[in-house]
């Protein structure tokens, strides 16, 4: 006869791939929704058009960061390229510049940062947490899936860091991170 600990360990190992698949499915669903939402989008916020769109297109056309003396407004050069580098990565993958790709890339960053609350042991609770976070972001920052601004991204990334720190069970890892 097998002892209970051995059987429990086997059962736990059997559940791990299923939890990963469920989490991945949620991620995939959010990515598909994001893709559909961003189809045929145009810039909706002044910052998106004035900075993020211009810097993204510059990166795609010139294949390098702007330098002093380039045709861009000098005020743009004073600001870090930030997420436009990730937008550029997606332009490069798709082989073209598109506003739709900009928003889609931004949403992948957002969804990835939100995914810190996913608990592979409790998918229903994870979906509730994701929903609450999206609602809170929308209440505080407006429609976060239709903006290229980084304010809400910085907030959710900071939240993600605190969430990881707070939920870490190994005290030594807490001290290292």
Question: Which stretches of residues belong to each language-model region?
Answer:
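Short amphipathic alpha-helical segments, especially helix-boundary/capping motifs
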Residues: 28-33, 59-65, 133-138
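Active-site lumenal/periplasmic loops and adjacent helix-entry segments of GT-C-fold
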Residues: 34-125
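Short hydrophobic/aromatic segments of transmembrane alpha-helices and their interfaces
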Residues: 32-34, 40, 47-49, 136-138, ...
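Start-transfer (signal-anchor) and selected internal transmembrane alpha helices
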Residues: 1-35
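Alpha-helix initiation/capping motif
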Residues: 20-25, 80, 98, 124, ...
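A ubiquitous, low-specificity "background" feature that marks scattered single residues
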Residues: 9, 53-54, 157
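Membrane-interface junctions at the ends of membrane-embedded or membrane-associated helices
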Residues: 2-16, 120-124, 164-176
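Membrane-embedded helix bundles of polyisoprenyl
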Residues: 30, 104-121, 125-165, 175-177
């Amino acid at each position: 006869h097998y002892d209970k600990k051995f059987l429990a360990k086997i059962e736990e190992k059997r559940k791990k791939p299923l939890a990963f698949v469920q989490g991945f499915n949620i991620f995939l669903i959010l990515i598909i929704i994001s893709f559909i939402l961003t189809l045929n989008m145009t810039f909706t916020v002044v910052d998106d058009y004035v900075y993020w769109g211009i810097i993204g297109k510059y990166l795609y056309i010139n294949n390098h960061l702007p330098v002093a003396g380039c045709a861009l407004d000098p005020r743009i050069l004073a600001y870090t390229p930030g997420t436009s580098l990730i937008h550029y990565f997606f332009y490069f993958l798709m082989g073209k510049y598109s506003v739709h790709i900009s928003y889609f890339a931004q949403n992948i960053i957002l969804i990835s940062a939100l995914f810190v609350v996913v608990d592979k042991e409790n998918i229903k609770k994870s979906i509730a947490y994701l929903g609450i976070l999206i609602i809170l972001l929308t209440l505080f920052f407006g429609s976060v899936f239709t903006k290229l601004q980084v304010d809400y991204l910085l907030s959710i990334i900071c939240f993600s860091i605190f969430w990881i720190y707070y939920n870490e069970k190994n005290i030594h890892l807490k001290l290292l991170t």
